[in-house]
Amino acid sequence: MASFNESILPETLRSIDSATFTGSYQALGTPLVYAARAVKWTNNSNKDVTLSWNGTVDHEFIPAGSSFIFDVAANKEGTNQCYIAAGTQFYVKGSAGTGSFYMSSYYA
């Protein structure tokens, strides 16, 4: 039987109400506390959302009613792990709408 030394744990769910969207980038909650192995963005609003890792450049487009999972540690073993750095702040922009936009993050 395999030996498992690590557990995956969630950070606090981050969200922003799409009614507050202005068309400019806004911080999506707080920066990551831990280096993330996987992140899921869920657009539960009725508006398309653009995601940025720096608040300036467009990095991902997440249509209304959809989600996007970024599993940077998938199929990685040993010391060659890839993570999203602790302290990373994500930003979103879109037109004001109804519903919320969420981010779930997971660390080991």
Describe each region flagged by the PLM.
Residues G29-P31, G65-G87:
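Beta-sandwich interaction modules
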Residues A27-P31, D58-H59:
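Local beta-strand/beta-hairpin segments that build beta-sheet-rich folds
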Residues R37, K47-V49, G99-F101:
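Short beta-strand/loop motifs in extracellular/secreted proteins, especially
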Residues L32-A38:
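Extended extracellular/luminal ectodomain segments enriched in beta-structured repeat modules
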Residues N44-F61, S104:
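Short, surface-exposed beta-strand/strand-loop-strand elements in extracellular ectodomains
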Residues V39-S45, V92-G94:
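Asparagine-centered strand-capping/turn motif at beta-strand->loop junctions
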